[in-house]
Amino acid sequence: MEEDERRDIVMSRASSCMQWSQWQLLDSILPTGGFAHSFGLEAAIQTRLVSSPEDLETHIIHVLDNTASLLLPFVYSALKSPDIETWHKLDGILNATLTNQVSSKASMSQGSALFRIAASVFTEVPNLKMIRDASLGSKNVCFHHAPIFGLVCGLLGMDSETSQRAYLFVTLRDVLSAATRLNIVGPMGASVMQHRIAIVTETVLEKWMNREAGEACQTSPLLDVVQGCHGYLFSRLFCS
């Protein structure tokens, strides 16, 4: 009886500690460089595709749906098998799948930063540092963000649904942060919009979650085209 109680206490504490890791992984203070990217929003504003809060909300929903259809399969596949061989394979597939240089560079930049931070912060998971160190010298690894996010979540012991929901949360958070700095919506309006879009995001998650990398696809090719124009903007605040 005492052993069962002790086991329950240990499991409860482990679960609580995991929640702290989950929250830290989603905290905007984690220096992964997400603040430097607008997910194509800046280009959409300058090309007049987004010019009001209403346009912004529609744009964000399309971004979330495209992110879920294209990138959630890589998150899911990586967290299901969080090992170096699977990650390298998924990284290569995603590198061949991304169709514009701007989004590809943004993905590599954020992925590299996330892996560096995760290996330094979550020292209780030595495999993070081991996998990163073993891959740093390889010319065939691009360090794309989605597979690394899935790998980190898998090694931290996060469940599949929470990990995929977390990826969409990070996307929603960063796009709204960019919108605030681009003065399309204020901080209060962004918070209200985030809460409202969360309901739609859950529907998007249910539609696209638990798919293999081979099922990845784009649902909004126009977003991809617009983001690819980012490098041609005369003046810009964000890297993508």
Curated annotation (Swiss-Prot):
One of its GO terms (biological process) is urea catabolic process. The keyword Transcription does not apply. Gene3D superfamilies: Urease accessory protein UreF. This is Urease accessory protein F. InterPro entries: UreF (IPR002639), UreF_sf (IPR038277). Transmembrane segments: none annotated. It comes from the Eukaryota. One of its GO terms (molecular function) is nickel cation binding. The keyword Acetylation does not apply. URED, UREF and UREG may form a complex that acts as a GTP-hydrolysis-dependent molecular chaperone, activating the urease apoprotein. Disruption phenotype: No visible phenotype under normal growth conditions, but mutant plants cannot grow on medium with urea as the sole source of nitrogen. Belongs to the UreF family. Coiled coil: none annotated. GO terms for cellular component: urease activator complex. Required for the maturation and activation of urease via the functional incorporation of the urease nickel metallocenter. Keywords: Chaperone, Nickel insertion.
